[in-house]
């Protein structure tokens, strides 16, 4: 297995995401990413499966209980990826071969699993991407183990 770290825009000491490959199978993990940048997009382009941050809904952050400095941090380019930007990034990644994504690192205070899923899937569908056929979208939950995804021969499928 080949593990390739790549830089991500986050306000931590040398933060990285990861791209994994084994033969023709590829997957990536990109969370704690403040914004869409060509560097990390290039690193996960072509990955069949991704764990991708959909941290927050901008409206929930702006009108939520967090202090102003924390809101600025979350919404900043080195903070966390919002649902809409996640959707825009995923659309490009599906065009490069991504078949399955787990929406991850959802904020407990500034997002809802259904909201993240509906925002991302709605944007994909409006752009002509068939969710379920062109790409599988799932939400990684904080409170339990997610469904298993099996990658084989360049295809992804849910485990039986």
Write out the residue ranges for each language-model feature:
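Core dinuclear metal-dependent hydrolase active-site scaffold
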Residues: 1-49, 143-144, 148-160
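Cap/insert and terminal regions of metallo-dependent hydrolase folds
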Residues: 38-138
